[in-house]
Curated annotation (Swiss-Prot):
Annotated transmembrane regions: none
Catalytic activity annotation: (E)-4-coumaroyl-CoA + 3 malonyl-CoA + 3 H(+) = 2',4,4',6'-tetrahydroxychalcone + 3 CO2 + 4 CoA
PANTHER family: CHALCONE SYNTHASE, HYDROXYMETHYLGLUTARYL-COA SYNTHASE
Annotated organism of origin: Bromheadia finlaysoniana
Molecular function, one GO term: naringenin-chalcone synthase activity
Annotated keywords: Acyltransferase, Flavonoid biosynthesis, Transferase
Enzyme class: transferase
Pfam family membership, one: Chal_sti_synt_N
CDD domains: CHS_like (cd00831)
Record-level GO BP terms: flavonoid biosynthetic process; polyketide biosynthetic process
Active-site residue list: C165
Protein name, per record: Chalcone synthase 3
Gene3D superfamilies linked: 3.40.47.10
Length: 394
């Protein structure tokens, strides 16, 4: 007698919740220090005659709370591609030529580190999720990474282009569904971002573009996600408890990006921090209602640091203690805003800080946590996390 459909479906699914099993990160070698960046930026874009605008940009950089960023674009590359340095010059071909090659290469570095920490052969990877806002190509960056890593040709690939800063949450939401609905699945998730698509010279009439030039940096992060980990050989870092996405009310046009002949342009409204802080309480209440959690200082925080104003207003609105957003602020300071990759860097920062401080769990000694992605839409991704005990912790 043929097995019942329900039995077949049950056998296809994992038993337990999805968990992050390993994390790896990577940046280009070229580090740019924020204190020196205004002079460098206005010199390389031949804009030093715009003295008042340069002073505004210096103030933006000073207020950014960023110490340094990493960028693939070096002075040599920019000198060879002067149209990238202009504000409105046709330059998409030159930008595309860079990112379609370099985005998968940077992704490979992060993925190799994640796979090494995981400790299993790459042949066990069943699914690949690749996310980037940097360039579009066919076959995509997911295909290129599959070839670079030597993954099985039958790996199930998912390519997410042009999502923006919320997408670090999106990939976790998708990975959770894949891991929990496919028994034995091991999902490699990679976010790789290179600002070669958005770098451009200054304009006195487009200060929102200048804000982006003060904030964005390059980086790639990779994680392995799976359910029912092998207790002998796999070490979970965080469980993915729930995941949801929402579009904030009255936020249309708050963050826009448009791919044009001049590259990818970003447009930001000043009230983005206000829109997020106004709505974040509802996102938290909806996410944590099943757990009965209402004290936002009793959970650990991984919030996308779009800029310091977003973190500041969230902190004030929710009455968070200063240390709650320390991991997010530290990643912003050391790397800048790396779009989709940022929250995965913060996830890595969280587990490292917790271990180094001798905390009992990967979430600063706390059990429950939240990961937030904010981006175009205005879209918010909310992931509820559960930490795991750190071996040997008191």
């Amino acid at each position: 007698m043929a097995p019942a459909m329900e039995e077949i479906r049950q056998a296809q699914r994992a038993e337990g919740p999805a968990a992050v099993l390993a994390i790896g990160t990577s940046t280009p070698p070229n580090a740019l220090y924020q204190a020196d960046y205004p002079d460098y930026y206005f010199r390389i874009t031949k804009s030093e005659h715009l003295t008042e605008l340069k002073e505004k940009f210096k103030r933006m950089c000073d207020k950014s709370m960023i110490k340094k960023r990493y960028m693939y674009l070096t002075e040599e590359i920019l000198k060879e591609n002067p149209n990238i340095c202009a504000f409105m010059a046709p330059s998409l071909d030159a930008r595309q030529d860079i990112v379609v090659t370099e985005v998968p290469k940077l992704a490979k570095e992060a993925a190799v580190r994640a796979i090494k920490e995981w400790g299993h052969p790459k042949s066990r990877i069943t699914h690949l999720i690749f996310c980037t806002t940097s360039g579009i190509d066919m076959p995509g960056a997911d295909y290129q990474l599959t070839r670079l890593l030597g993954l099985r040709p039958s790996v199930n690939r998912f390519m997410l282009y042009q999502q923006g800063c919320f997408a670090g949450g999106t990939v976790l939401r998708l990975a959770k569904d894949l891991a929990e609905n496919n028994a034995g699945a091991r999902v490699l998730v990679v976010c790789s971002e290179i600002t070669a698509v958005t770098f451009r010279g200054p304009s006195e009439s487009h200060l929102d573009s200048l804000v982006g030039q003060a904030l964005f940096g390059d980086g790639a992060a990779a994680i392995i996600v799976g359910s029912d980990p092998d207790s002998a050989t796999e070490r979970p870092l965080f469980q993915l408890v729930s995941a949801s996405q929402t579009i904030l009310p009255e936020s249309e046009g708050a963050i826009d990006g448009h791919l044009r002949e001049i590259g990818l342009t970003f447009h930001l409204l000043k009230d983005v921090p206000g829109l997020i802080s106004k709505n974040i309480q509802k996102c938290l209440l909806d996410a944590f209602k099943p757990l009965g959690v209402h004290d936002w200082n009793s959970i650990f925080w991984i919030a996308h640091p779009g800029g310091p104003a977003i973190l500041d207003q969230v902190e004030i609105k929710l009455g968070l203690k200063a240390e709650k957003l320390a991991a997010s602020r530290n990643v912003l300071a050391e790397y800048g805003n790396m779009s989709s990759a940022c929250v995965l860097f913060i996830l890595d920062e969280m587990r490292r800080r917790s271990a180094e401080a001798g905390q009992a769990t990967t979430g600063e000694g706390l059990e429950w946590g939240v990961l937030f992605g904010f981006g175009p839409g205005l879209t918010v991704e909310t992931i509820v996390l559960r930490s795991v005990p750190i071996a040997g912790a008191e």
